[in-house]
From Swiss-Prot:
GO cellular component: extracellular space; membrane
Signal peptide range: 1-22
SMART domains cross-referenced by the UniProt entry: IGc2
InterPro entries: FN3_dom, FN3_sf, Hematopoietin_rcpt_L_F3_CS, Ig-like_dom, Ig-like_dom_sf, Ig-like_fold, Ig_sub2, IL-12
UniProt domain Ig-like C2-type: residue ranges: 29-106
Protein name: Interleukin-12 subunit beta
Keywords, sorted A to Z: Cytokine, Disulfide bond, Glycoprotein, Immunoglobulin domain, Secreted, Signal
Amino acid sequence: MCHQQLVISWFSLVFLASPLMAIWELKKDVYVVELDWYPDAPGEMVVLTCDTPEEDGITWTLDQSGEVLGSGKTLTIQVKEFGDAGQYTCHKGGEALSHSLLLPHKKEDGIWSTDILKDQKEPKNETFLRCEAKNYSGRITCWWLSTISTDLTFSIISSRGSSNPQGVTCGAATLSAERVRGDNKEYEYSVECQEDSACPAAEERLPIEVMVDAIHKLKYENYTSSFFIRDIIKPDPPKNLQLKPLKNSRQVEVSWEYPDTWSTPHSYFSLTFCIQVQGKSKREKKDRIFTDKTSATVICRKNASFSVQAQDRYYSSSWNEWTSVPCS
């Protein structure tokens, strides 16, 4: 992820005395300090500059502690670990003049830390963000998992392409589900994003990038996912599933309809369907049939059930969940 390098002037609050960009502004008054994490690591030297034209009578404190760390318009600190992070504030005469929150971002053996989010391991290892789209309208849902529920914040940025990014607008992340896994709780967070100038019928040439900034207490981490919408398509299940017995026959005619959320016209945005009849025992063999039509004739015995699911006809993305109806 690219971040704009700090521009230093008289009113700047943080200055990094290093030729490398090891500190950058996440948002107003919040800065990420990138740290190589190993024993006896030197850390990063940071110079704080108070946002005031005053020169004298200025003192510095860290977080809520009243302990004075230094005096003068600038304060030089060495950020080596989380104990050196936090909110630094400059004061004069009992009044807070300006402040800056420093957040370490750990790198061990050349790899950025991924302690805040849980690896979902689907469709592959080190999958922290997962995204899906119900159609080609440019609306996307992304989600991630964590075992953390307190002192946790997220911010999301998304675009199509990185060299000349096109707009994708994301809402705020919300807690969407809570599960118990053995002795642990697992929290699912999600966000809705919309491509600003989506063209459903256009060929995708650049992937969509989704970037999540995660902060737990004073720890910062960054997670990214890159994809084409065609790769994350997962239609809603077919609707209005019906069975019609045929006279003098063991067979029934089953029919269904495209989901309301699927892109139109269906002659262009087509689905293919997988159908099956499942006996009362789940161990019974299931015969699956693939069809591009929205009806079929099958043998549907008593106590069995008929199921159907859908997938984009022209691109091998995800199948949706089965929707079922009893045979009798």
